Amino acid sequence: MSQQKGKKSRINVEIYGQQYSVVGDESTSHIRMVAAIVDDKMRELNAKNPSLDTSRLAVLTAVNVIHDYIKLKEEHEKLKESMRQKGME
């Protein structure tokens, strides 16, 4: 859920052992959740690819997250189309 228009949240988060100051339109709890998911994904991928440096690990994480996003978006579109065909929308 977005905060009031124009109101930004600023929060410090830790991702893969590094501190980042993040500013966003969402609540601080949402920003913390996003940071935790990124951290978890990086650690998961590092466990499978321990020889990757942090930069390559970050790129691999981004590729994996975008892959998941695209698959979910495609699934969402299929469900919307199915609902449209059934007259449920």
Curated annotation (Swiss-Prot):
Belongs to the ZapA family. Type 2 subfamily. PANTHER family: CELL DIVISION PROTEIN ZAPA. This is Cell division protein ZapA. GO terms for biological process: division septum assembly; FtsZ-dependent cytokinesis; septin ring assembly. Homodimer. Interacts with FtsZ. Residues 64-86 form a coiled coil. NCBIfam families: PRK14126.1. Activator of cell division through the inhibition of FtsZ GTPase activity, therefore promoting FtsZ assembly into bundles of protofilaments necessary for the formation of the division Z ring. It is recruited early at mid-cell but it is not essential for cell division. Its main location: cytoplasm. One of its GO terms (cellular component) is plasma membrane. It is found in: Cytoplasm. HAMAP family: ZapA_type2 (MF_02013). Keywords: Cell cycle, Cell division, Coiled coil, Cytoplasm, Septation.
